[in-house]
């Protein structure tokens, strides 16, 4: 039997006569959680966990911690220094008292004209587009990571920006002293965009089937922004069937939302898929504690019991 929970297929191997073995018998060993990835998750949790106020989350350091899932020995200092350097260049182009339009123009000149940052349209799903160190080095990114660079450079010159998580695209928003909003598209060289242009973008992505809603242009929290980066990366890894890397990413999502039943369940199923049975059953049982009346509770309970029985035979 092949079981599916939360969109993930659970493997069941066949015995010699062609019948199904026990659900978990296709795993011949219990694979422990990687210590290095566990350390990255702990470091990430210290930056973004529920104990941290959202506005105090350091987006630059949190994004570089995500990059440590791929580059475990990554030194943050050169990349933080690079952001400082970009900010100094932008500030040098500003008058003592700058209007928002002047600041946006200075940021756009430094990032896109002088430095040559651009959207990676040729290889949009390259995982490196989601790692801040790679984006700063290669000067290539996707909308959300280019927005993060733009946002962090702007912050360093005292120009506050907020993320806007429009479906299928990511923008930035600035509020002037009178509360008027300006939308900025970092993926398209810092262009200032209108609501009509946002609708045109949705029409391109969704073939005219998704009308622009006011909530699409609301500011998102820092946690939401980091979660979107992680979801992008998770989807890239799952599409490539690299479940081990997808698991490391979901571990970080759970660091942001440790009480999210769906994220805990998804981590359980990824742990199961890579043979981390003890971690899988612990997550499934935690999911049941958080969502005892979930529609799939019986199926999850049966799977957890099957794993417990399999583990007991190995002791």
Where do the language-model regions lie?
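A structural boundary/capping signal
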Residues: 24-315
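Generic extreme N-terminus detector
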Residues: 5-6, 18, 35
